[in-house]
Amino acid sequence: MKYPPSLVSLIRELSRLPGIGPKSAQRLAFHLFEQPREDIERLAGALLAAKRDLHTCPVCFNITDAERCDVCSDPSRDQNLICVVEEPGDVIAIERSGEYRGLYHVLHGVLSPMNGVGPEKLHIKPLLPRVQEGQEIILATGTTVEGDATALYLQRLLEPLGAVVSRIAYGLPVGGALEYADEVTLGRALTGRQRVSK
C-alpha cells in the first residue's frame, strides 16, 4: 500500500529535521495526524511565528527576538569574558549552570572540511573585532575532532590579538563513578586536575 502524497510529503519534510530519520518522521507524521486540528494549527502558528520573529543577535549571533539578545543588552555582564560556543543551545546550557556572567559568541557550527564547513561558513570573522588585549576568551566547543580542531584554529587566531585564550575543562560528571568513565574522559580529568591545597 502506498501512502497518500500529502502524508509522503509530511514524512519527507519531518525527516529533514536534525536527528529525525525516516522511521521517526513516519511516527511523528502519524502522531500529528491523530491530533485535533486546533493543536496542529497552534503548532503551525508557533513555527511561523518563530520564523517571523526570531533572528540572530548582530553582536554574538545568539537567537533573539529583540534588536540585541538579553546577554549583550545586560550591562552587568563581565565585558572581559567571551565564551565561544558552537550552537545557541550551548548558551542555554551554560546559563543554566549559573556559574558564568560573561558574554558569548555563537559560531553556528564547527570546522568540518569533510562536510564542506570552513572558517568562512562560521561566525568567526565577527568575533575578531570584539577581542581586546587582555580579554579572556573561553573556547567551549565540544570534545569531538571537529570541536577540538575549531578550538585550535580559534586559539591560533586569537592569541596574536593579545587575548588570554582558555578551554573549558573536561572530565568526570558529578556523581559519576571512575569505573564507568572512558579512557579519554578519565585522561582529560587527570590532566585538567585542580589543586585543592596550598
Curated annotation (Swiss-Prot):
Alphabetical list of InterPro entries matching this protein: DNA_Rcmb_RecR, Hlx-hairpin-Hlx_DNA-bd_motif, Rcmb_RecR, Rcmb_RecR_Znf, TOPRIM_dom, TOPRIM_RecR
Statement: the UniProt record of this protein carries the keyword Zinc: yes
The organism's place on the tree of life at top rank: Bacteria
Keywords attached to this entry: DNA damage, DNA recombination, DNA repair, Metal-binding, Zinc, Zinc-finger
Presence of the UniProt keyword Ion transport in the record: no
Transmembrane domains' residue ranges: none
GO biological process, one term: DNA recombination
Sections of the chain in a coiled coil: none
Role description: May play a role in DNA repair. It seems to be involved in an RecBC-independent recombinational process of DNA repair. It may act with RecF and RecO.
Family note: Belongs to the RecR family.
Name of the molecule in the record: Recombination protein RecR
Source organism: Deinococcus deserti (strain DSM 17065 / CIP 109153 / LMG 22923 / VCD115)
Organism taxonomic ancestry: Bacteria, Thermotogati, Deinococcota, Deinococci, Deinococcales
